[in-house]
Amino acid sequence: MDMVTMNIVDSAMVAICREMGVNVQKTAYSTIFSEAEDFTCALASPEGDMISVAEFCPAQIGGVPLLVRSMVKEIAKIEPGDVIVHNDPYRGGLHTPEHTMFKPIFVDDELMGFVVSIGHFVEVGGMVPGGFPGEATEIFHEGLRVPPVKLIKRGNDVPEVWKLLLANVRTPRGNYGDLRALISAVDMLSLIHI
């Protein structure tokens, strides 16, 4: 691939990630997304290598490869239409307030990569609101740990997972809106025709 074509493709990939981020800003319930921009959006290979990323929260970017690898290792069957959520620091997550959404990209039944969105949630359960207890002595004080699990399977919500996530936080309505914002970001690629 010549340099001009490579730059055009790179710019298109970054633009996709930026557009995903704008979608998060406009649809999230909490101001930590809309004002503080404490989220990021990326494209990754099936192996977890970063293809492209938007620059919303640079601190989250470095975690993408490990997050993808951890998720792929734990989810036995990844199918079109799946959306996987994950925040467990012991499985590559950044910390419990950082929820990551993954959506596989398939072309003719072949896994080509993942659309990834990461966002900092204001409330994740735990001993204090916000997930940053100074008195914490163990991970369970910090909030609900979510190993990689399908939140949406083949395009349909998994109600039991939604119930579990929303029953363990002080602000279920806000968390619902922010989860949907991150999902809307990973869904955007299906609306874009390259």
Please provide the spans of the model-predicted regions.
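Short, basic/aromatic recognition patches
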Residues: 12-36, 72-73, 90-92
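Mobile "lid/hinge" segments at catalytic clefts and subdomain interfaces of large enzymes
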Residues: 111-190
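A short, polar/charged loop-to-alpha-helix boundary motif
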Residues: 59-71, 122-131
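Regulatory sensory and allosteric helical modules in signal-transduction proteins
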Residues: 46-53, 65, 69-88
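Conserved small/polar residues in nucleotide/adenosyl-binding loops
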Residues: 192-194
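N-terminal cofactor/phosphate-binding cores enriched in small/glycine residues
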Residues: 18, 22-24, 36-41, 46, ...
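Short, small/polar residue-rich loop motifs at catalytic or cofactor-binding pockets
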Residues: 35-38, 97-99
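A short, hydrophobic, proline-anchored segment that marks a local hinge/packing element in signaling
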Residues: 100-107, 116
